[in-house]
Regions:
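N-terminal signal-anchor module of multipass membrane proteins
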Residues: 1-10, 18
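Alpha-helical membrane segments and immediately flanking helix-loop junctions
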Residues: 20-83, 167-177, 183-207, 216-219
Length: 281
């Protein structure tokens, strides 16, 4: 009970139960799904499902909204590097995160509400063992992500793809090297790109969730992000001439360091949660 994660669950676990109608154990998956970037949310949702912390219906519901570009990519790579503005990156991240949270909240009414007394406390494995287990998982995820990005980058260099379609196919190069309005950029970031979608097809199959259902909610999230970004720009206007795209392309390596750290952190917390002895209070 004195462990850091138990404190985290006791302090914030009710957020996932009240706001998303999901078990308290889902809080870390949702949190790292938002800040860690795609496909972190899908990978951590898969961990929860395999450990029996959530059922297939809850897993499907998680996959409808637990999908976000994260702080490292949206704020740093898109905002700071591409638009020369961390502030603008924060606004883009907020438009995506709020879109995901809104969808998750609406879907919480789809199933019977969880009982208030249903929550978990854990007795953990050692930090050393958890780190040993988490690092290979994170490394494998980074390798898969990088492989898909390189593959789609090679395809886009070989095949002439119209610029408006590039972010739909491969989000990193499509958004960072494209020239789109800020609301449209937010929409593309929320969609995530086919390259990212392919990385989580195996997870969707485990949940018995069709890709078309996942795609539908990506489109809904994109529309919401578009209008949320327009709303943010209305209340916090920016001078577009100041935030013009950088003249040099964004290197993939400028994105992956932060993503790698967040993936390690996400897997580390997941191991602490899911390889422990569960007690229902």
């Amino acid at each position: 009970k004195s462990s850091a994660n138990n404190i985290l669950i006791k302090l914030f676990g009710n957020f996932s139960r009240v706001f998303f109608n999901l078990p308290k154990a889902a809080f870390s998956a949702i949190l790292f799904g938002l800040v860690g970037g795609y496909p972190t949310g899908a990978l951590l949702s898969e961990e929860l499902f395999e450990a029996g912390e959530i059922d297939s219906n809850q897993a499907k519901r998680l996959m409808c909204f637990n999908f976000c570009g994260g702080c490292g990519f949206i704020i740093t790579a898109v905002g700071t590097v591409t638009f020369n503005s961390t502030r603008l990156g924060v606004m883009l991240f907020l438009s995506n995160a709020l879109s995901s949270i809104l969808i998750g909240f609406i879907l919480s009414f789809k199933e019977k509400r969880l009982e208030k007394s249903e929550y978990s406390l854990f007795s953990f494995t050692s930090l050393g063992d958890a780190l040993t287990l988490a690092t290979p998982k994170a490394a494998q995820s980074v390798i898969v992500i990088t492989a898909y990005i390189v593959l789609f980058s090679a395809l886009s260099s070989t095949v002439k793809i119209p610029e408006p379609l590039l972010p739909i196919i491969e989000i990193t190069n499509g958004v960072c090297n494209g020239d789109f309005s800020l609301p449209l950029t937010a929409a593309f970031l929320s969609f995530g790109g086919i390259c990212i979608h392919l990385q989580i097809l195996g997870v969707l199959r485990k949940f018995k969730m069709s890709y078309f259902e996942f795609l539908l909610f990506r489109l809904i999230s994109s529309v919401l992000s578009y209008f949320i970004m327009k709303l943010l720009l209305y209340f916090f206007p920016v001078d577009l001439s100041v935030f013009a795209n950088a003249s040099t392309p964004v290197r993939l390596s400028s994105v992956n360091v932060t993503l790698s750290v967040l993936l390690v952190a996400g897997c580390f917390v997941s191991v602490l949660d899911l390889n422990s002895r569960r007690k229902v209070v």
